[in-house]
């Protein structure tokens, strides 16, 4: 099945949002962290691959940052992050792990100097309430290493904070002019979870001021992350990717509404002491949906 407008919009927004957090005016990443990886049995990998888990989640894939991630050292030898040139070694930027062919073995020594996100980002297809009620959270602070332990129940419902959860809340079409052009009005909601109020204040302040910016629509099939959240075309730069679609569809940010959630009753009910903020992005896209 081909991706439709909503998938294109959500993935394009995610890439824009992720990149916005890495810009010099907010710089939500930590660089040059000593990182070691250890072998872990992962149930989500194909049977012909194995994984080594690093100490930090959500490595920065963007190449334009200071000290970009270029690869890892395996048994003392540098291995580039380009899977097409390194013998099918994949850097899983989302989970912070190295994925290798099964024949590589389980006794490798893998290290890196890593640049990691200070704010993790997730695309969510669940409601905010379900995420809060049904998920587990680890607030590791990206300057503090955290090792996956197989005795712990870390799965797809475990998220590492601070984090932003991005979801498409609503959308609708309004007739704009004769000829079939319509205005698609969409609302994307971002929920921010952390125990650090400084981080929440910084995020909502920065993104409140993005009102009236524009976002290039990047086709879903051009999403830069592929197998195990590795970069399809290495190195990856968001600005370079979006420049390929400057003549395509553009989405405008009409308004950004932000609010903090202060509810001791909610915190007691879910037994989680983090702070919550929401950001509602009201978006407008002029398009010909029936052509």
Please report, for each region that a protein language model flagged, where it lies by residue.
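Short, charged interaction patches at domain edges and termini
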Residues: 1-34, 155-157, 169-184, 232-291
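Extended beta-strand solenoid/passenger and fiber regions
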Residues: 2-130
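Generic structural motif
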Residues: 77, 103-105, 113-117, 169-171, ...
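Broad, structure-driven detector of short, well-ordered beta-strand segments within folded domains
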Residues: 89-92, 164-168
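Surface-exposed beta-strand edges and their flanking turn/coil or helix-capping segments
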Residues: 113, 125, 179-181, 203-205, ...
């Amino acid at each position: 099945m081909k991706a439709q407008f909503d998938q294109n919009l959500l993935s394009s927004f995610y890439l824009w949002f992720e990149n916005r957090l890495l810009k010099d005016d907010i710089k939500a990443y930590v660089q040059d962290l000593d990182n070691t990886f250890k072998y872990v049995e992962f149930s989500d990998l194909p049977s012909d691959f194995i994984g080594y888990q690093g100490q930090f989640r959500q490595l920065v894939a963007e190449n334009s940052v200071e000290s970009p991630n270029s690869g890892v050292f395996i048994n003392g030898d540098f291995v580039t992050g380009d899977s097409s040139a390194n013998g099918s070694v994949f850097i899983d930027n989302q989970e912070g792990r190295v994925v290798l062919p099964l024949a590589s073995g389980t006794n490798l020594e893998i290290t890196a100097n890593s640049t990691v996100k200070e704010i993790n980002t997730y695309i969510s297809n669940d409601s905010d309430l379900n995420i809060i009620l049904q998920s587990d959270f680890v607030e590791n602070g990206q300057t503090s290493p955290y090792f996956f332990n197989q005795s712990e129940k870390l799965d797809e419902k475990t998220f590492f904070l601070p984090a932003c959860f991005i979801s498409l809340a609503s959308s609708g079409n309004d007739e704009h002019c004769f000829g079939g052009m319509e205005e698609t009005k969409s609302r994307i909601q971002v929920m921010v979870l952390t125990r650090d109020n400084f981080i929440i204040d910084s995020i909502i302040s920065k993104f409140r001021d993005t009102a009236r910016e524009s976002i290039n629509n990047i086709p879903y099939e051009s999403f830069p992350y592929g197998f195990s959240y590795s970069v399809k075309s290495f190195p990856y730069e968001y600005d370079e990717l979006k420049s390929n679609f400057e003549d395509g569809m553009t989405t405008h940010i009409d308004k950004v509404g932000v609010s903090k959630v202060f509810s001791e009753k909610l915190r007691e009910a879910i037994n989680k002491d983090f702070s919550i903020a929401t950001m509602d992005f009201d978006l407008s896209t002029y398009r010909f949906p029936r052509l």
